[in-house]
Regions:
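Active-site rim helix/loop that mediates acceptor-substrate recognition in acyltransferases
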Residues: 23-51, 58-60, 66
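Conserved catalytic-core motifs of GNAT/GCN5-like acyltransferases
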Residues: 116-117, 129-151
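Conserved acetyl-CoA-binding loop-helix of GNAT-fold acetyltransferases
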Residues: 85, 91-104, 126, 130
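A short, internal acetyl-CoA/4′-phosphopantetheine-binding micro-motif in the GNAT/acyltransferase core
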Residues: 80-90, 117-118
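Conserved GNAT acetyl-CoA-binding A-motif
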Residues: 106-118
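Conserved acyl-donor/pantetheine-binding loop and adjacent beta-alpha core of acyl/acetyltransferases
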Residues: 50, 54, 58-82, 142-150
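C-terminal "cap" of GNAT-fold acetyltransferases
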Residues: 141-179
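A short beta-loop-alpha structural element at the N-terminal edge
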Residues: 2-16
Length: 179
């Protein structure tokens, strides 16, 4: 199922909040406020996947600065996270273009990209591994994240070792996280 991937606009906030509320059970109004705030946060970038005019998925890329005082802190860098796809459309090719787009944006700024996952999220791990992410450690701390079952995995991808199609797309993302 082909999806159009584009940056999030203010017009997408309600659709994203509804999608996330359906997944997490959180209050849609609070989610709307948080997502709207993310649009003006220079450390975050958000994208949506659109099929037939409807937002069917979204994802974010976040700049994380490690707290050096925290033992086992995840390293500073650009982290792929927050992928949500309509449950009826999962495993139909929507998550991969969202992930490729975020990798291109990350690689336009840095030589590596990071990703964290619950050890039980086999579908996500398989997709990210196919795109060049490799496990770094299972012993790390990331602010505000607790993993179901208690086990998370920190992954890293480098420009040199990631999928060959990515470098050709990097030009469009130059400056995405520049001051």
């Amino acid at each position: 199922m082909p999806a159009t991937i584009r940056r999030v606009s203010a017009a997408d906030v309600d659709a994203i909040a509804a999608r996330q509320a359906g997944r997490s059970g959180q209050d849609p109004a609070r989610l709307r406020d948080r997502i709207a705030a993310e649009l003006s946060d220079s450390t975050r970038r958000l994208w949506v996947a659109v099929v037939s005019g409807a937002v069917v998925g979204y994802a974010r890329l976040t700049r994380h600065d490690a707290d050096q005082a925290v033992p086992d802190a995840a390293p500073s860098g650009l982290y792929l996270g927050g992928v949500v796809v309509d449950p009826l459309l999962r495993r139909q090719g929507i998550g991969e273009p969202l992930t490729r787009t975020r990798m291109c944006a990350a690689f336009a700024e840095e030589r590596e990209a990071w990703y964290i996952a619950n050890a039980g999220n086999h579908a996500s791990i398989a997709m990210h591994s196919a795109l060049g992410f490799r496990e770094i450690t299972r012993r790390f701390e990331f602010p505000g994240v607790r993993f179901t079952g208690g086990v998370g995995i920190l992954f890293q991808a480098s420009q040199e070792n990631s999928h060959r199609e990515l470098p050709a797309k990097l030009t469009a993302f130059r400056g995405a996280f520049s001051p």
